[in-house]
């Protein structure tokens, strides 16, 4: 007997689905494809953290201490740029070929990184790897939307959040183990067999999913180039600010000014071309706009907590690096579990706004408590404050993936999904740069503990903004099939 995912709907609706090219998907194919998707997401998330602990050893091995931070920067910039382009092209040419292509590119680039003989080669190969990661992540996260209708998608998005958190926890540990054991090259080479398995699974079991046809499509080369010209200098400058450079120095102000000019050009181009990389009309949908705003602010807040809680522990409470890791572990586990549970709950309720408001309120409360810490704060109090903040963030972040996909027209589903991650990457870079500036400025005048409190107040302010914006978030029922209801989406 064939096992299929059944969607209860009227006969005329079923007929409409057939006319539009949508059909029931085989359960086994969906489950195995989802396994391949999770492999892709795990590899992409792991690669962001596994390198960190190996960087000093890599720099020593390749005799290039002065430029080793570029190994991270090149990867981040390339993956950010590739996200919207990969999302758009997957909307037009299909998710399967871009998921497999992105994974294959990632695997080849990983092998090249593992074989690099100079730091220049490694930086170049890391940039290539970032391009593959961006395409892979855009296609993988949108494939979930193709496999599951919004009413069933919450559980899968929760699983993705859990996989990402697990990768972030495992990454530094695995990176240290491989670096101290077989050698730093294996932090890249380990991706090769895992990625090949993912490619084979997706190639073999990806179900036949038709998509709305895009007639006479032409690649928006001018839009793509102007977007790259805008994103690259801005992200590069933000990374330099995070390393301690001044905002008003020529090396920062000029790239940011140039990037803003290119972004303005990009927006003007996208408004005029027939097939834009990022359709500007998409942002007229208030659900998408508010969800993207909140997604970016939430990620900036999460990065702030992840980076500056360990600093408070070690520099103010005089904890060891090991103790800092032990305190952050419950925070990470909380996020993984609550994100998964939230995905299940949204699917059961078919609603999201109340949960998002509740999560934002909890996160604001946790950040408020963090902002009131002092050298007399106990480690247990810091742990509880951090876990409370993580609990709230874990409730809201998966929701905004779902709200964007639920509100997006099927013809721009890949672009809309990729924009969630694009906004998160850019927001986290801006957040780290701003936090670093606050820390540097306030430490000179008031000391480190007070400066960290100022950072936490900024994080609390971001989360208050998320709460207020969520109050204006229009709630529409989660669709029960991947057939568009045009009236609901406009």
Name each region found by the language model.
Residues 2-205, 341-343, 349-351, 356, ...:
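Transmembrane-helix bundle of Major Facilitator Superfamily
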Residues 148-154, 182-186, 212-218, 317-322:
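Short juxtamembrane and helix-loop transition motifs at transmembrane-helix boundaries
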Residues 215-227:
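Membrane-interface "helix-start" segments
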Residues 96, 125-126, 151, 219-222, ...:
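Structural detector for helix-capping/boundary residues
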Residues 119, 213-214, 241-247, 375-376:
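Membrane-interface helix caps and helix-loop-helix hairpins in membrane proteins
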Residues 32-46, 51-53, 66, 72-74, ...:
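12-transmembrane solute porter fold
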